[in-house]
Amino acid sequence: MEGDFIVPFARRGSIVGADELAMVGDLVDSGDVLSAGGLRDQFEARFAKHVGSRYALSVTSGTVALELAIEMLDLEPGDEVIATPQTFQATLQPLLDRDVRVRFCDIDPVTLNIDPTLLRSLVTDRTKAILLVHYGGYPADMDRIMAIARPRGIKVLEDAAHALGTGYFGRRPGALGDIGCFSFHSTKNITTLGEGGMITLDRDDWAERIDRRRNNEADGLYVPDATEEPFLLPWMKFSADVYRWTCVGVRKPGTNATMAEAAAGVGLVQMDKLDSLVERRRWIAGRLDDAIARFPGTRIQRVPSGIEHSYHLYTFFVDHGRDDLVRALHSRGVEVQLRYFPQHLTPEWRWRGHGLGECPVAERLWFDSHMNLPCHPGLSDAQVDHLVDAVSASLRDVLATRQRAS
């Protein structure tokens, strides 16, 4: 039991154990470089193959991935960006210091992703990009979204932080739009020792720019410097090749977002486990679906043929009594979360002119209807049994109370 909960939300979204420890131990014992080495290259190649993109470039967090991806959009003052309100703040934070107009697009009431019908009505001649999230691992309606974006030259950024292991008609998020971003935070479907991110894309020019940006903007030629003989100074004589070359041509501010070799090595091991980790999530989700669907006034996320939900988040909906149900579940030791508070109602976006009524579906679902239950591979069979029993009992109690009141 974690804290006061018999069935807690994930502090770790995957299983990390002996295999990961052995990978890190072997790296330490090898004496190999601990940054920007072979493991990073292998992890990126493996990830690109899984997603189906030409490039996968690792960075230190999902937030950094989003920051660098948004830079590729080359937004100018007066440009408009259409974004989902149903997301964690990191998706939109890089826009706060840009002189662009954000237009929030309301969400589909089942998938909680951008509603393509509403999206079309928000497009103007100034629309430069669409920022979407594959909420909880349920993929957005990408065919309809891209049919709107492509003819108009609008770039589509996929925040796929929830969607590793998700399938979309034989393809995968991160390779459906123009650029994709993933997170390997501790709670995500796989982790790289707590933090990490990946950017997936096909464009050569963007890949080159991102690679430079994550490596201190080193984009120039490498030329011999004063450490070449006969100019080797005494204090350099034990430095091998470290000081023998100097980069020229650095033109812009850069950063160091290099994923450590230990993190990349763990990521490789986690990729081997991905299918089984996601399958466990789907099994738990199936148990919950079967239990919840029996009760009137509830809705589950039914998944159509061709869609493979990865269930980073398990979401369901009630017509009435959501807050009573949350309290009933807490009393039975089940942790419940509500993700996410609509971004257009947060102080930073209200200050920019957004407010209540702008996205009525997102508002109604958050305040009255939707909720997230634990659905992660760290749950034991006994915990899953308790979860299903607690959900059923709590729904019965809430329904009985409403019937007596009526």
Model-flagged regions — what are they?
Residues 57, 82, 103, 156-157, ...:
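Structural detector of well-ordered beta-strand residues that form the stable sheet scaffold
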Residues 1-72, 76, 150, 247-250, ...:
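Conserved PLP-binding active-site segment in aminotransferase class I/II-type PLP enzymes
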Residues 158-193, 208, 247-249:
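Conserved active-site segment immediately N-terminal to the catalytic lysine
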